[in-house]
Amino acid sequence: MTTDDRAKAVAPFGFTPRQARFLALVMRHAGVCLLRQYATFAGIVQGQKTRAFFHKLVSHRHAISYACRHNRAKLYHVHHFALYRAIDEPNSAYRRPIPANRVAERLMMLDGVLTDPGLDWLASRAEKAAYFTNGRCSVPPEMLPRLNAAAAPRTDHAFPDKFPIGIATDGRPVFLYVVLPTVRDNFRAFLRRHATLFQTLPSWTLRVVLPRALADAYEGVQAVVRDEFESPLYPHTVDELKWYFEQRRRIGSTQFYPSDERFIRAADAFDAPRFDSLYHCRYCGR
């Protein structure tokens, strides 16, 4: 089903086309939402129309409302089985109660999607793999992102990240990434998993969603992108990096570093977060 198909399936429950499209996006990508997100999506002020819509959701038992911290707003969880069945996702995990520590991530994910609600947003692994291996893209399965690049190139192992991918009318994909303040950021690993796919596409967009608390991290995000895509590693550098990593692994936890001049030069050259991340991915399973 496309986004339009899902909206048409939800509308018979008594919703306007605009409300139905919003609900379809919520159920596919978050399960929860705020009044301000609908107001932004609809291009209206957060007034009577918005409150009436959410009152209807609660009164018809399509959603449950929860008071947010300090009672500054209400969180709405869309859980009604028939609505999810209408969009062909009756077993969606988004129907289940959401842990408090996942709310911010879900809302940020929805914010990212609502930035371009007209895109056809792909949510599942199967949808993503089907789009990129068929049709106009025709990307070989071995070039799709996966956690273990050495694993067999099966499409069901591809796209381990849960972030949705939006598809524009011209076929250009928009890759979404949500930066979370409460967990170790895996942005570099995300970029590396997708690097081969990015290289095969004629055009693509990377959209990074940052919480307000991390607004100052924008420059850092840009620096990571420049590191990964604008500073390629040439074959000789890769060979030297592998040698250096192997020496580090042998040293282990002894904290004894050799006085070998080659090792000292390599340690100085590769003293950067980019290479630390590569080392931990290679030897520490992170």
Question: Which residues fall in each region the model found?
Answer:
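Glycine-rich, often proline-containing surface loops adjacent to acidic residues and nearby aromatics
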Residues: 32-34, 86-95, 170-176, 205
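Basic, Lys/Arg-rich alpha-helical nucleic-acid-recognition elements, primarily the DNA-binding modules
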Residues: 1-86
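Exposed, interaction-prone assembly regions rather than primary DNA-binding/catalytic cores
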Residues: 97-188
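Short flexible/disordered coil segments
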Residues: 90-92, 127-144, 196-202, 271-281
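Short, amphipathic alpha-helical interaction segments positioned at domain boundaries
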Residues: 79-106
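Hydrophobic, Leu/Ile/Phe/Ala-enriched alpha-helical segments that form helix-helix packing faces
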Residues: 26, 42, 54-58, 112-120, ...
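C-terminal regulatory/effector modules of DNA-binding transcriptional regulators
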Residues: 169-286
